């Protein structure tokens, strides 16, 4: 487990990878803050909200932020809107000492990486399976 703040950024079904990380960490408690951001197109896609909210209610160091990218699809949605990676970054003034896991499509993962690195996170601070199976083309 990381020894600093952990930021988990999931797009759509990428939540399943983050769920696995959380379930691995939970038995020992969250020694450092864990922030889970889950981005979906519309609020009805938030199929694990109850589980995420239960983690938040059990652990003071766990924070859950659902984000809807297309609020027009969810007229009753009163939560956060926008791109999940941007919303995650906006919550932190200093990202120089965080660990970030990102799960989503290549475009989303690389745009999140670029934004966090631009704000001071070392590139090695971010992890995603995308880096292995869809590496960024060399320029």
Task: Show where each model-derived region lies.
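Conserved beta-strand elements of the Class I
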Residues: 6-7, 101
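The start of beta-strands in P-loop NTPase/AAA+ ATPase cores
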Residues: 5-6, 124
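Histidine-anchored nucleotide/phosphate-binding helix
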Residues: 15-27
């Amino acid at each position: 487990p990381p020894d600093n703040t952990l930021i988990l950024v999931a797009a759509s079904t990428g939540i399943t990878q983050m769920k696995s990380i959380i379930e691995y960490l939970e038995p020992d408690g969250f020694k450092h803050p864990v922030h889970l951001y889950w981005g979906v197109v519309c609020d009805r896609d938030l199929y694990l909200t109850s589980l995420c909210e239960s983690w938040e209610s059990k652990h003071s160091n766990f924070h859950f932020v659902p984000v809807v990218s297309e609020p027009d699809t969810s007229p009753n949605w009163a939560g956060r809107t926008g791109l999940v990676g941007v919303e995650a970054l906006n919550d932190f003034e200093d990202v120089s000492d965080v660990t970030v896991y990102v799960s989503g499509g290549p475009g989303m993962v690389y745009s999140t990486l670029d934004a966090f690195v631009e704000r001071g996170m070392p590139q090695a601070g971010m992890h995603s399976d995308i880096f292995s199976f869809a590496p960024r083309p060399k320029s």
